Amino acid sequence: TDYRYKYNSDLFLILPGTEIAAVLFDEKDGYLKMHHLNGILGTKAMQEQAKSGLFQHMERIEPIVAYGDWDGRKVTEAMAENLRDHGCFITYNHPVWSRVEPHEFEIGGIYNSLEIYNYNTVNESGTGFNTTYWDEMLRKGMHVNADAADDNHNGNFPDNFGGYVMVAAESLTHDNILNALMEGRYYSVGGVDGPRIDQIIIDGRNVTVSCSPVERVNIIAGGYVGAGTTIMAPKGEKITEASMRLNGTETYIRVECVDEYGRTAWSN
């Protein structure tokens, strides 16, 4: 869909996008697995380089359908290539809910972001948390950012305003927002009015996190067993800063700020 020209203003910006699907059925038409990928209209440069042109408003992209068995990895690669050839920023969505195997989607370099929190499927069936897969990819050396989303359906349970990203962009323009997303200059939030990450500073081997009042800060690291740390507030209190000294063997770090209700903000 593309509603930019209907709703865009100086204070509100629509990012045109589409979700494409592939479905593996059993012989009784029961859903075995799915791939869902989002394509968000990229920067002007990405649009100009789109090999297949751009998707149009209300254009339907037919789902890929298979029965019994499939090469799930090749399907993911083909779907990502289709979105990339149409000038899109690409996210891979809700792998736990989709019941896919890691080898079917843990592929470096073909999509920009892995959805680690899906508010709809958290409320539907408790299958919306996906950080384990993200860490698997990061531990394997695949550089991929993460995102949180509502996946809003307005169905039988609340699924709006519970998953979103906070972007550090120069201004509210399409290219500035997309450049920030491409470069990972944002953090993701799970939960209505969840925590805020104000700043992450790496000074030499010291990591310092500043955030809104939370119950704990997890500094998660790649490397040896036991890498990273958790800083918890004293019982009944909250913290707004946490720090850790790196030992130099970490392969990556990321931050989680968690409040007393379990609402979480994730850095890239």
Language model segments and positions:
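A metal-dependent hydrolase metal-coordination microenvironment
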Residues: T1-F89, N93, V100-P102, I107-G109, ...
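Charged catalytic cores and adjacent phosphate/nucleic-acid-binding surfaces used
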Residues: E27-G42, R99-N268
